[in-house]
Amino acid sequence: MTTSTPTTSISSDLRPTVRNIDEARNMCHDFASVLTVGPERHEVSDFGHPDHKIVSFDDITVSYAGYRAPTFDHVREIVTWGQGRSNLLVHCHAGMSRSTSSAWGIAIANGFDPQEAYDLLRNNHPIERHRTWNPRPDATTIMRQRAFIPNELVLKHLEKFLGLRSGTLREIAANGSAIAPLDR
């Protein structure tokens, strides 16, 4: 994995925060703006946030009957709405795919270098407690970062929308996809 040292003078307030739907529900009022990517309006109607954008589509990379794949128009709507917003919370259901790719595109639109934006978002991704499978009561618990797996179709649309070479974001994601356990 390639990890860059942040070199930008761009305000860290312009780096979106990524969470899952349950975390977003609990902390949405700590943020100036909230972007829901994926879940339907009825799933987040209890947020009650005054600056809340909802863009609904399924977490798929090809079209299937009965499912909505992310489109170029979805991506344009996400980035256009999110660009320039400081203290932005971006979430989907699991906080792993639609939200990570959307936040990444917004960070790039805010002036972050694609690799730097990826590294910053990934390094600030939530830590989760995982219990290893063990039938005994002394099972081992490890801490590791939540999976950070940007939706490839969203990335493809982002590359086009942001004027990047085709494959740029998908290559960065493919080269930085390994997640190691933390020493905690």
Predicted regions and their residues:
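PTP/DSP superfamily signal
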Residues: 2, 80-87, 105-184
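Glycine-rich, flexible N-terminal cofactor/catalytic loop recognition
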Residues: 2-55
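A structural signal for well-ordered alpha-helical scaffolds and beta->alpha junctions
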Residues: 34, 71, 75, 147, ...
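Short, solvent-exposed loop/turn segments at secondary-structure junctions
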Residues: 39-42, 59-60, 95-97
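Helix-loop module immediately N-terminal to the HCX5R catalytic loop
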Residues: 53-90
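Recognition helices and adjacent regulatory flanks at domain boundaries
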Residues: 76, 93-96, 118-121
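A phosphate-binding catalytic loop at a beta-strand-loop-alpha-helix junction
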Residues: 88-104
